């Protein structure tokens, strides 16, 4: 074991992720891409960092904000919906919110929506007055209802929210929607979006000042290098000087063109980072505009 890995236990960085769920595998892939690896404990809830002194806790997603607030974990990967729900609940109870969103991670996207039975003739939010709304996000929903001056009854459920109207325990629901297939299966239709959500990296507002500070800065830098390159590719080609303006016009989502030293062919060697999809049709447009020898290269990581 290297000296850098053998730090005192609480000088090791701790990251909490969902033990089992839709965010688990994307979170592990992201952290692995950041250069982290672990040795898993027998109970499979704690993973000891081997490549770096960064340990992993596998927990319920709704436990992650609390673990960060208590200082048990330094970071957590959790849905913004869960983070905001617990923050809203803490504020309503007069408690401080000691954590913050450090990075949006661009996976686990969904929306918190109000959904009503398909037979409803939906017109506007005035129809919510006096209605019973089933949800697992009572604090977020309460804030939204108060903002819009709507008096409605909240029916708090821990799961299976979508079945509440059919059981007669609620008139409509407020729940997470990804594809909408679950709503359709229960004869519900979305009518109002409360918030957009995605997986986020959360951490304490007051950052650690010991050995963990350097680890945190390094991890964030690596993560930024990965997130910045998401859906990005390195485009390389040759072109004559007089064609560069037209080629630049065809690359609105690219960084400024970089001209490489002349290789003696009479054409310029050019490269740029494109932050969008490069389709075959797009390559053919560039070729017609004067680009030669086009190559698209995948870039896995970068340090700015």
Curated annotation (Swiss-Prot):
Catalytic activity: 1-(5-phospho-beta-D-ribosyl)-ATP + diphosphate = 5-phospho-alpha-D-ribose 1-diphosphate + ATP
Matching NCBIfam families: hisG, HisG_C-term
Pathway(s) it belongs to: Amino-acid biosynthesis; L-histidine biosynthesis; L-histidine from 5-phospho-alpha-D-ribose 1-diphosphate: step 1/9
SUPFAM superfamilies: Periplasmic binding protein-like II
HAMAP family noted in UniProt: HisG_Long
Location in the cell: Cytoplasm
Name this protein carries in UniProt: ATP phosphoribosyltransferase
Residue stretches spanning the membrane: none
This protein's UniProt keywords: Amino-acid biosynthesis, ATP-binding, Cytoplasm, Glycosyltransferase, Histidine biosynthesis, Magnesium, Metal-binding, Nucleotide-binding, Transferase
GO biological process: L-histidine biosynthetic process
Source organism phylogeny: Bacteria, Pseudomonadati, Pseudomonadota, Gammaproteobacteria, Lysobacterales
InterPro entries in the record: ATP-PRT_HisG_long (IPR020621), ATP_PRibTrfase_cat (IPR013820), ATP_PRibTrfase_CS (IPR018198), ATP_PRibTrfase_HisG (IPR001348), HisG_C (IPR013115), N-reg_PII/ATP_PRibTrfase_C (IPR015867)
UniProt xrefs under PANTHER family: ATP PHOSPHORIBOSYLTRANSFERASE, ATP PHOSPHORIBOSYLTRANSFERASE ATP-PRTASE
Cofactor(s) this protein requires: Mg(2+)
Primary localisation category: cytoplasm
């Amino acid at each position: 074991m290297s000296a850098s890995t053998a730090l005192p236990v609480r000088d090791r960085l701790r990251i909490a992720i969902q033990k089992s769920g839709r965010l688990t595998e994307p979170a592990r892939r992201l952290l692995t891409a950041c250069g982290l690896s672990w040795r898993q404990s027998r109970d499979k809830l704690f993973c000891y960092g081997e490549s770096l002194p960064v340990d992993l806790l596998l927990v319920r997603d709704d436990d992650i904000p609390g673990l960060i607030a208590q200082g048990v974990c330094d970071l957590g990967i959790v849905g913004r919906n869960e983070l905001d729900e617990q923050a809203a609940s803490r504020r309503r109870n007069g408690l401080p919110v000691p954590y913050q969103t450090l990075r949006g991670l661009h996976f686990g996207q969904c929306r918190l929506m109000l959904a009503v039975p398909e037979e409803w003739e939906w017109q506007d939010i005035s129809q919510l007055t006096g209605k019973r709304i089933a949800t697992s996000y009572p604090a977020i929903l309460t804030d939204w209802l108060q903002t819009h001056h709507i008096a409605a009854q909240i029916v708090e459920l821990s799961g299976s929210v979508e079945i509440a109207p059919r059981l007669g325990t609620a008139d409509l629901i407020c729940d997470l929607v990804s594809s909408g297939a679950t709503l359709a299966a229960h004869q519900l239709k979305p009518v109002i979006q409360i918030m957009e959500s995605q997986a986020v990296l959360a951490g304490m507002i007051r950052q650690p000042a010991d050995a963990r500070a350097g680890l945190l800065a390094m991890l964030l830098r690596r993560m930024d290098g990965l997130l910045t390159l998401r859906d990005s590719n390195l485009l390389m080609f040759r072109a004559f000087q007089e064609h560069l303006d037209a080629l630049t016009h065809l690359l609105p989502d690219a960084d400024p063109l970089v001209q490489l030293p002349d290789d003696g062919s009479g054409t310029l060697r050019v490269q740029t980072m494109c932050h969008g999809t490069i389709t075959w049709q797009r390559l053919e447009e560039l070729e017609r505009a004067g680009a030669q020898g086009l190559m698209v290269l995948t870039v896995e990581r970068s340090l700015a």
